[in-house]
Every structure is written in structure tokens, then in C-alpha cells.
Amino acid sequence: MFKGAGVAIVTPFKEGKIDFAAFEKLIDFHLENNTQALIVLGTTGEASTQTMEEREALIRLAVQRVEGRIPVIVGTGSNCTDTALQYTRQAEDLGADGILVVTPYYNKCTQKGLIEHFTQIANATKLPVILYNVPSRTGVNILPETVATMSKVENVIGIKEAGGNTAQVLEIKRLVPEDFKIYSGNDDQIIPIYACGGHGVISVASNVIPKEIQEMCAAFMEGNVEKALEIQLLYKKFIDLLFCEVNPIPVKAAVSALGYIENELRLPLTPMEEVNRKKLMDEMKKQNII
């Protein structure tokens, strides 16, 4: 689907509504800075707080603005299979290039339930499907054997692995076909996931430093591990601060500091604590990001 750095793009809000003008500017920012894919309506995009109508407008704008230059991948997961199917059909109808499907959250289903859930969604679309494992948020871990089962479904082409367990990533790599894509879901594990046979990252940090994250990925893919590691280490503290409060609270503060968006979230998310915001701003100044 893509190799390198895709951005899990934030959704800008202004006075409670989506700021579409700001969203266009963000897309242009990523096109100018070599981002390899646009992931819309994911965790970082606050998808769970948006209506069907808002989703439609956001997807439509992303597809139109990108004009096929990079893949537009839409988060269509839900803890209700029927709702996930509706989101998936909507994304396909609006011209998305692929979908990202998170494990059902709160329900805490079995591995059998995961397989049936993902299979129904994959069978309902011609789009490439990327599974999304983030057990810290969902309460459910996709086991490597389950990933291997799903990899046999023709249009299930990869996984965003945000479990933080490199041993699990290695086991997935051992079990799946060679062309099955493994993307890091954690910015602090880009190099480790590459070393486990990964193909890139679906990145939060790319909202702020897209050029640098893609340079890190490109360096590793070109065999320059030393340069890739140098970039990973250079921005380690910044990346840590992006997750000192729950995502996307810090990254929205960071993108706001760049001047692209208002620092606005939808409840139940609230703005960053001032003590943490100051640490983030200080590090951004230190790294000449602002």
C-alpha cells in the first residue's frame, strides 16, 4: 500500500465544527513534505466523536485535495460490526484508497470474534484492508495466529501494530506472507519495527515533523541504519512528550504551535495541562521546530 511514513492526521476544529480550510492546509503541508500516505479518521483524528455527515465531508475533501498523489486511507473501525460496514462502504464510495480497521473496543471479543468481524468487513469491500492493533485502548490484542489467519483474506494486506511488543511483531512476521505489510503504530518504535521486518509507520509525530520522519524511514530502507537511528534518537524526547498525555491532546497543541490549527479538541478530550504544554513547547524550540 505504501512504504515509509504515513501520517495519522489530526482533525482541526474551530468553535466546535470541523475547520475544513485548516484541513486543506494540513494536507498541502504533508504533500509538500513527502508524507507517503494520509490516514484520515483514526485515533489521532478523533474519529469516535464525528458524525456520519462529518466523516463524509472530511473524506471527500481529503480525496479531492490529494488527487491521487498519495494513498488516502480511512479509519472505518467500530465496536459494532454493522457500523464498521457502513463506514467502510462510505469510504469506498467516496474514493478512498484503503481502510484501517481497529479491533472492536469495549466489547472485548474473542479471537474468533475478531476473525469474523474483520472477515465481514474485508468481504464487503474491494479496498485494501489494514488491521489495527492497539490493545492499550481497545482491551483486545490481535494474536499473531489471528493476524496469520486474516492474511489469507485477499484484500487484508497489512497491520498497524501499536501493541509495543517487538516479540509479537517478530512472530507476526514469521507467520504471514512476505508481502504482508507491518506498520509501526508507535513513533518511538519505528526503527525496532523496521528491524523486525516492518514496512513503515502510521505516525502521530508526522503531524509536526513529516519531513524528518520520512527521512528516518527512507534512510533505513536505503540501508543507512546509522542515519535512521540518529534521527530516531534526536527526536526521542519530542516524541515522548507527544504522548505525555493521551493522544491527540499533545499533538494538537504542537500543530497549533505551528500555526495550522486551533488548539481545540472534542469532549471528553480536554486541552493539555500547562506544565506539560510548556515542556513540549520548550523541546520544540530546542529542536527548531518552532
From Swiss-Prot:
The record marks 43, 106 as: Part of a proton relay during catalysis. SUPFAM superfamilies: Aldolase. The keyword Lyase applies. This is 4-hydroxy-tetrahydrodipicolinate synthase. It comes from Alkaliphilus oremlandii (strain OhILAs). PANTHER family: 4-HYDROXY-2-OXOGLUTARATE ALDOLASE, MITOCHONDRIAL, DIHYDRODIPICOLINATE SYNTHASE. NCBIfam families: dapA. Gene3D superfamilies: Aldolase class I. Homotetramer; dimer of dimers. GO terms for biological process: diaminopimelate biosynthetic process; lysine biosynthetic process via diaminopimelate. It is an enzyme of class 4 (lyase). Its EC number is 4.3.3.7. The gene is dapA.
